[in-house]
Amino acid sequence: TDATGKPIKCMAAIAWEAKKPLSIEEVEVAPPKSGEVRIKILHSGVCHTDAYTLEGIDPEGIFPVILGHEGAGIVESIGEGVTSVKPGDTVIPLYVPQCYECKFCLNPKTNLCQKIRVTQGKGVMPDGTTRFTCKGKEVFHFMGCSTFSEFTVVAEISIAKVNPKAALDKVCLLGCGISTGYGAALNTAAVEKGSNCAVWGLGAVGLAVAMGCKAAGAARIIGIDINESKFEIGKKFGITEFVNPKKFCKSVQKVLGEMTDVGVDFTFECIGNVGVMRAALESCHKGWGTSVIVGVAAHGEEISTRPFQLVTGRVWKGTAFGGFKSRDSVPKLVDDYMNKKLLLDEFVSHKLSFKKINEAFDLMHKGESIRAVLDIPE
């Protein structure tokens, strides 16, 4: 039935407050306003960033909210002035938009479009209001996406139109985790052929980093995790050797120094632990080693090292969404997946129905899943 211009009633997973399980409720999704698009979400991954907000440690976290930012679906209707997509198009919502106009979009050095940053951070659409209501209460948006809902409304600049033949239960992962890790290696670090790399944290993002290092032609890729159940799967993504830091009485810096003759060319922290970030930098090769921070640390945490580490030629960098300019890159990444240039299926360890969403969070916290993907319409 055509609901263009009218509100849609559907099911969504609502976070009413921090530290409480999500609750599946009927919500009303308003039609898209000017420059907005309403999307029928078919699949969504569950990411640590969703948990970060749910646990109440995100300073921008506001409740009640519909979480989820790793989704894929079909355009249901478009607001006034929208030209880049039409109803029926296959799309991936983007938490890093690309407006093509702000000074960030015009600068090739960054992918951090700022056009709707302020309102997105406040959980509202660019006009300052929300499109979700539940039981008469306004419900906030999350990261400009809110994919834990059968329908969502996003800004046109936050949408990648992708190949309609793509398997949406796989390419939804390009909305966050896989693009983030893969691009950290290819774009931010610009890993070189024949180099040695080390990756801390072998979840979906760390494994995607390894996949990027392999694509760049790295000679050795060392995977570091205290959960050894991740080691076997790591081999699929190109990791050549594994280190469990708990098995050594010396620092991981020393262990890697001995393994690589002085240090590693490229290191990646995919956990969000500031102590590990320091270890990753200090494991870098003197004179040219580069360390990339990919993990999100808790609010207010600070990094430290001795300036001598940088004076002697190490570089410390950070990355968001893998440095990919989102609307330009995500459609190409989908094509790369379809042309077997990058893996996605191997990241999906669990497929769950929407009503089992809290189970997906439990699996993630226990370290039992790489990525759980939800089938959104029941």
UniProtKB/Swiss-Prot annotation:
The terms under GO molecular function for this entry are: alcohol dehydrogenase (NAD+) activity; S-(hydroxymethyl)glutathione dehydrogenase (NAD+) activity; S-(hydroxymethyl)glutathione dehydrogenase (NADP+) activity; zinc ion binding
Where Zn(2+) 1 binds, per the record, is at C47, H69, C176
Its taxonomic placement starts with: Eukaryota, Metazoa, Spiralia, Lophotrochozoa, Mollusca
> Where does this protein reside within or beyond the cell?
Cytoplasm
Please provide an example of a Pfam family that matches this protein in its UniProt record. Answer: ADH_N
- Site features described as Important for FDH activity and activation by fatty acids, chain residue numbers: R117
Q: Which cofactor does it need?
A: Zn(2+)
Q: Quaternary structure per UniProt?
A: Homodimer.
Q: What is this protein called?
A: Alcohol dehydrogenase class-3
Q: Which Gene3D superfamilies match?
A: Medium-chain alcohol dehydrogenases, catalytic domain (3.90.180.10), NAD(P)-binding Rossmann-like Domain (3.40.50.720)
Under the heading PANTHER family, the entry gives: ALCOHOL DEHYDROGENASE (PTHR43880), ALCOHOL DEHYDROGENASE CLASS-3 (PTHR43880:SF12)
- Give the N-acetylthreonine positions (modified residues): T1
Reaction(s) catalysed by this chain, per the record, are: a primary alcohol + NAD(+) = an aldehyde + NADH + H(+); a secondary alcohol + NAD(+) = a ketone + NADH + H(+); S-(hydroxymethyl)glutathione + NADP(+) = S-formylglutathione + NADPH + H(+); S-(hydroxymethyl)glutathione + NAD(+) = S-formylglutathione + NADH + H(+)
Per the record, the similarity remark reads: Belongs to the zinc-containing alcohol dehydrogenase family. Class-III subfamily.
